[in-house]
Amino acid sequence: NRLLKQLYARKIIDNSTYELAISEPLPDEPHPLPQTAPHLVSRFYQERNGKYSISTIDRGIQTQIENAAERWSNEFNRSDIRNLAILVIDIRTNQVVAYCGNVNFERKQAGNQVDVIQAPRSTGSILKPFLYYAMLQEGSLLPHTLLPDIPVNINGFTPQNFSLQFEGAVPASEALARSLNIPAVTMLQRYGVPKFHTFLRQIGLKTINRPASHYGLSLILGGAEATLWDVTNAYAYMGRSLLQLPQTECSLLLADAEGS
């Protein structure tokens, strides 16, 4: 209203315009802009230099995973875990249908603007299914093959299960389902670290880029780093292989936007 009064005093607006303007209610505070897949938007901006892009994201699935991320973030905050990411790939089309690089994008103090999908993190136990897959494919392992879950010492390396217990003879399928460490280590010893290292590189785990000897048997227990992007694509590789689908490169863009 002060501005309107000044405009009227300087005869920039007439009296009727002034009276009509001050009688208008003040507008409400503008709604915040939607923050759908903000980390993906940032990725497109960096990789495509702001070029017009049409993503493969499914809005419904994206909304579901963002809600799930927010819900689990509230749970993890109790354990002082501030960052998480979710990536969903449709293995039949090999398109990314949901991309949540982190939670609370607007919060800078907890590193929430970091796209965790592209950030290397410890592999933990996430490589175990790849070892089982590789051994199943070559016929050196069956789901019911009994594996030893007993105390072992391999050149001074003594792996332990999370429970600190030993189960004796365990079927391979159960050892995988329970993520038992000792069977995984003995399997890797039998399969060969260099061979497994090569396989992981072949299926796209690019950040496992040091010699196999650098990792040793700890490779199967989190002794390496990988990105969620590479790991999810590698899991999609296994899924497509089992469904006998062609192995194509994962896409974030619709084909008709590639040349735009």
Predicted regions, residues:
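Non-catalytic, structured segments within soluble enzyme domains
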Residues: 1-63, 160, 201, 205-212, ...
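Flexible glycine/proline-enriched surface loops and loop-helix/loop-strand junctions
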Residues: 47-50, 111-117, 167-169, 177-184, ...
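Extracytoplasmic/secreted proteins, especially bacterial periplasmic and envelope-associated proteins
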Residues: 2-6, 39, 43, 52, ...
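Peptidoglycan glycan-strand catalytic modules in the bacterial/periplasmic cell-wall system
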Residues: 1-12, 104-107, 174-181, 189-192, ...
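Active-site SXXK
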Residues: 7, 65, 94, 114-147, ...
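Conserved catalytic neighborhood of penicillin-recognizing serine enzymes
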Residues: 30-46, 141-196, 240, 244, ...
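Short loop/turn motifs at secondary-structure junctions and domain boundaries
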Residues: 76-82
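A penicillin-recognizing enzyme superfamily signal
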Residues: 55-76, 88-90, 99, 107-116, ...
